[in-house]
Amino acid sequence: MARKGILGTKLGMTQVFDENNKVVPVTVVKAGPNVVTRIRTPERDGYSAVQLAYGEISPRKVNKPVTGQYTAAGVNPRRHLAELRLDDAEAVTEYEVGQELTAEIFADGSYVDVTGTSKGKGFAGTMKRHGFSGQGASHGAQAVHRRPGSIGGCATPARVFKGTRMAGRMGNDRVTVQNLLVHKVDAEQSVLLIKGAVPGRTGGLVTVRSAIKRGEK
């Protein structure tokens, strides 16, 4: 079966009790409603995908090229517009322009991959950014406690290798957490309770897709 996907908003974390009265930490995700605004086909575009729109926005804040896409689809402008790749050409037949998607596309007990933008931490040193252990706290160590150490020899190799872990900007990256359990689907509120943590801040945009490594559950 083709992978399903939906755009949503992370509302925060809470905890619920399962059937055995054990506490389960969950992330609450407002999933949809999404509207299908365009369908990509191999014959016309060279690949299979579906374009989804999500979130409220004033039409005055949407530029003309994007407004044209919404007009062609016959839907009101939305805040977010994203394209989800489909597994094969046959999966395209499950969608049509103007179709509305809600949290009901997932079921209790299914597994999903959640993608979001991680929290930005600003400029961070190697201990925070990469988990370096730092240097000695005493025995002659002076003002080097949190320094990374050598980043390369002066004569050989006479340069810093690409990919060397150094201080720099941390966070604000696209992150995917795989194989998270959907603890419960609230169809009435279009809300997903996903076991565990998902990337990003409260109020951030997330993409929820069927788990690619576990298949349909």
From Swiss-Prot:
Q: Name one GO biological process term.
A: translation
Domain of life of the native organism: Bacteria
Does the record carry Ribosomal protein as a key word? yes
In Pfam terms, one family for this protein is Ribosomal_L3
Pull one GO CC term from this UniProt entry. Answer: cytosolic large ribosomal subunit
Keyword list (alphabetical) reads: Ribonucleoprotein, Ribosomal protein, RNA-binding, rRNA-binding
Keyword field contains Aminoacyl-tRNA synthetase: no
Entries under InterPro entries matching the protein: Ribosomal_uL3, Ribosomal_uL3_bac/org-type, Ribosomal_uL3_CS, Transl_B-barrel_sf
Under Gene Ontology molecular function, one entry of this record is:
rRNA binding
Family matches, as SUPFAM superfamilies: Translation proteins
Gene3D superfamilies per UniProt:
3.30.160.810, Translation factors
For this chain, the family text in UniProt reads: Belongs to the universal ribosomal protein uL3 family.
Instruction: Summarize the protein's role.
Output: One of the primary rRNA binding proteins, it binds directly near the 3'-end of the 23S rRNA, where it nucleates assembly of the 50S subunit.
Subunit text: Part of the 50S ribosomal subunit. Forms a cluster with proteins L14 and L19.
Protein name according to UniProt: Large ribosomal subunit protein uL3
